[in-house]
Amino acid sequence: MIDEIEQGIDGTELKAGIIAEIGSSEGKITPLEEKVFIAAALAHNQTGRPISTHTSFSTMGLEQLALLQAQGVDLSRVTVGHCDLKDNLDNILKMIDLGAYVQFDTIGKNSYYPDEKRIAMLHALRDRGLLNRVMLSMDITRRSHLKANGGYGYDFLLTTFIPQLRQSGFSQADVDVMLRENPSQFFQ
């Protein structure tokens, strides 16, 4: 990881700007996954690069943060992915309280969790003044997600979900915090 940050990826001059996506299994962190988290923490501590994690079905985010924190990682430099796949507000609030960012990044995957419920959780976070710790994105992971194959496509977040947020009472400033300002701050 450190070599890809400092020297370049696969012999190129392209250098990694983030340590990602390190993940855990549903409901547990296996010994091998723990090794990867420790390696990511070492790379972060040496390079200062931010870390992005993967949770399986919105589980183990708090445990991921505890593991990284035990290795000396500044949790304000960590974003926990896939926090929006179930009713998870209590854990999201705890992760934010620890200083981490949370990602609502499976937008459009209504077969896992409906966007209406994602919007309700975002309202709860906005009402608490916590949008400054939330990032929005999409997890396009299969060809079936592409428009050419009948999926919702890469533009769904901007053309469908953001208008739904706006109609539900979010301001453009709220949206900009989650789409622009937070990612910019995270990468500084």
Spans of model-derived segments:
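Active-site gating/metal-coordination segments in enzymes
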Residues: 1-45, 101, 106-111
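Distinct, well-ordered alpha-helical segments
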Residues: 30-34, 58-72, 89-96
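Divalent metal-coordination and catalytic microenvironments
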Residues: 44, 102, 139, 175, ...
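Glycine-enriched alpha-helix->loop->beta-strand junction motifs that scaffold or abut catalytic
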Residues: 47-50, 69-77, 94-103, 132
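Catalytic beta/alpha-barrel core
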Residues: 50-56, 77-85
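Active-site glycine- and acidic-residue-rich loops that bind
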Residues: 80-86, 105-123
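Short acidic/histidine-rich active-site segments
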Residues: 105-106, 130-151
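Mid-to-C-terminal alpha-helical segments outside catalytic/metal-binding sites
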Residues: 156-188
